[in-house]
């Protein structure tokens, strides 16, 4: 009977250890995915900022010429 108890405890312990390792790996994968999503969001924000700056520059140069053409 004692042998069965020890075997059962050993099986349960090994199962808990393996479950713990799997949970840890799952959390690491989720963290990596979140970091990738954050990096992609930052890249998109950077692209939008650059795009808006470019549009603003074009508008600054084109708008005065367009207004002076209309006044003539």
UniProtKB/Swiss-Prot annotation:
Source superkingdom: Eukaryota
Tissue specificity comment = Expressed by the skin glands.
Q: What is its main location?
A: secreted
Keyword list, A-Z: Amphibian defense peptide, Antibiotic, Antimicrobial, Cleavage on pair of basic residues, Secreted, Signal
> Where does this protein have compositionally biased stretches of type Acidic residues?
30-41
Homology family? Belongs to the frog skin active peptide (FSAP) family.
Function noted in UniProt: Possesses a potent antimicrobial activity against Gram-positive and Gram-negative bacteria. Probably acts by disturbing membrane functions with its amphipathic structure.
Q: What is this protein called?
A: Dermaseptin AA-3-4
């Amino acid at each position: 009977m004692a042998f069965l108890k020890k075997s059962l405890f050993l099986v349960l312990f090994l199962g808990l250890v393996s479950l713990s390792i799997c949970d840890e790996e799952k959390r690491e994968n989720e963290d990596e995915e979140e970091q990738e999503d954050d990096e992609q969001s930052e890249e998109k924000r950077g692209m939008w900022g650059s795009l808006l700056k470019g549009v603003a520059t074009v508008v600054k140069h084109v708008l005065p010429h367009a207004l002076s053409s209309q006044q003539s």
